[in-house]
Amino acid sequence: MTLKLLLVADSDSQLLACQALADAVRALGGAVTVNAIPKPGTPAGVLGALERSGPLWAMSTTRLLADPRLEGFDAIGVYLTGSKLAEFRSTYRLSRQRQRQPLRPLFCGFNGVVLERFEEAIAWRLGYDLICLNGPRDQARLDLLLRHTPFQAQRSVITGLARNRPAPASSKARERILVFAEQVVMPAAPHERRRLVQMLARLARRSPDWQVLIKPRVAAHETTFHAVDTHISATLREALGSPPANLQLSYEPLPQLLQRSRLLATVSSTALFDALDFGCRPVVVADFGLRQDLGTPFFAASGLLRSLDASEDLDALEQGSDADPAWLHWVGYHPEFSAANLLRALTDLAGGVHDSAPLQLSHPGYVVNAADLSTNQLRRGAEAAIRCRDYDEAARLLEIAQLHRPDNRNIGRRLAAVRQRNRLLRRLALLVTPGLRA
Amino acid sequence: MKLALIAGCVAGRRACRLLSEALHRCGSTVTLIGPAPDEAAAEPDWLPLPLPQLAASELLDHVDAVGVFLDGESLRQFRRIHGQAAALRGRSPRPLFSGPFRPLYGDALAADLLPRLGVDLLCLQGEAQLAELNWLVQGTPQAQQACEAIGLWCLPTAPIGHSISQEPLLVVLDQPEIPPSPFANGVLYERLCAVARASPHWQVRLQCDQPLPPDPQQWPQTSLGWHHLQSSRPPANLQLGDHADPLPGLIQARVCMGIGSDWLLPPMVWGKPTVVLGDYGIRTAFNGPLFFGSGVMRRLMDCLPLDALLNSSRPDPTWLAWRGWSIVDGPQRLLRRLEALIG
């Protein structure tokens, strides 16, 4: 059976994750359409690559949920940020009920390695029919979180960290290039970012036969999930004045860089696994130590930690050990873990192998983010309550929304309106205060 | 056994004092040592020594083991100086034990554990932290880290007598940095005022969960206490608790409530009805992941009428046991492991 999947995403890193998943599913015989929710600043290169590889839609969530073509898919994969994930699940279910259409399985996942706030991320994802995890490491942490809770029945599947098809062995010798995969917030402190580029510059000076290319996460005019004040190009100018001739920024697509370079260095980027895919030797920068805020503990058992400052030169850095196979399996970089597991799990779901009843999210004494806790969900719920003239319920939902977004004046005004006890004044106040725009 | 316990911050000192009392009851001699925070906060039972001098001090040669309950950078500094000083004197460093002195979970626990890895014995609280440690160090050179779960040693969880107030009292734990904006705190304060007004036969007490300066002018604007002092007409049954110590208030309370304070655990252990406010969801910055499985999360508006809380809101005992409540012989466990270590 050929599975037809729809993948929904908005920001660049989520679109990249969808691109990788779509390629993998197509290679396994599945059909994939990607819907990129329009968002200002999304890199054109990312959208262009998606368009070249298969059908690409660009609809808002509201338009997408009203589109009759939605019925043609066997499952929908949602790659959005936490609150939007929960909101999509909730509005999708409501729209299917309204249109009397059957529900398709919804799945979600992560767009790369999860370095922090895993529990919070899961609290937004609970209730999806399947949560895709990177590897046994994440599975173990999910099990720890859900143990002794009513949510133990949450289904998950390990889909691995390999995002690119293995590069065919090339007879062409790789160039003496070190690619540094920049991350916008790791490290985040300006003085540490300056220290990082200074380390790279010293290494470049000690290795005149090499080129050191810093690959910025995004171009200065583009946006990613994290908002940053200082682009890496500015940090480079501030920290070095005139950098060595063999240290440059490169905006060449990462896959192309990795196919011709000998080395990739990173603090904690998922690009490390792209390097493995393309046969480029990765190293993890150990100079900042193992710090939770840098995500480096993830790589503690990798066998790839190296100090840039302590390395004699890049020739010496290249002679290091390979990644530890046990660690690669633990984090999910192993043939056992791939998109094939997702397709199998979705087929099982469709075939009724497992109980397909959605996970019950409301339990006394438990609160999960996914259970109608995004601000928009709360406001939408409040508007529904107002339409039913249940003003106490509307006030209750708006009060929670106001705790989340105390600075949102519209929520405050709407709350004041529903609290109005005089019927006439309340009606008037509801007319003049803004509800949630669709 | 002669032991030294070293702590710097308020939470560390409180935890070490509790551990010292428990170890003393087991027949050990314990010396509490730490840098003096300031003149006003000097405590008579602490030996005040600046950290670098303490780490290199020959005083430590006279104890069997040293419990180092300092935070990240101070701990690194202590271990480095202590190791170097011992090497210069041609002696072995003293056996060191350490561990989180707050009931941490998830990212916060990992961040706390990283600088402690490599000590002779890691003291954790319950099975949950042991499982997390194993997860964190899997495959790393620290995979064989010696560790022991010694229960909820860092909080006053020993049984208390019947000293609850005559009038029903709800104690709301005020975390001065959570929510992190003054405006958000103001909104929460107004909600608590509404709860107090809706419950005239209850007393509602805002209890800071860490010591605040004696001068209220210096209280942070992100504390509920600050908003209470600004309020022109607060409800008559809404009051402020002791600014220096949350314990008496918690003992008197019929019901305790908070967002993610460590101090929610003692009333849970004592069997008092406790509410973890779920209005903000599971947020890492608000310590939500720790209480996710507690079984006592609910939204503020679902807490009314307060009387209904008296017969509900008890935590899931399996969850509480998993956090360390089920371990009743923690100090003995610690001493057994230290004896084996010293040989």
Regions found by a protein language model. Give the residues of each.
Chain A
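Nucleotide-activated donor-binding/catalytic signature segment of Leloir-type glycosyltransferases, i.e.
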Residues: D229-Y251
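Hydrophobic/aromatic side-chain positions at a characteristic register within alpha-helices
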Residues: S374, I386-R387
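Leloir-type glycosyltransferase catalytic cores
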Residues: F299-S374, R380
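Conserved catalytic-core segment of nucleotide-activated headgroup transferases in glycan assembly
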Residues: A17, R163-T235
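A donor-sugar binding/catalytic signature common to diverse glycosyltransferases
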Residues: S250-G295
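Active-site and donor-binding regions of nucleotide-sugar-utilizing enzymes
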Residues: L6-L28, N35-Q152, I158, A401-N410, ...
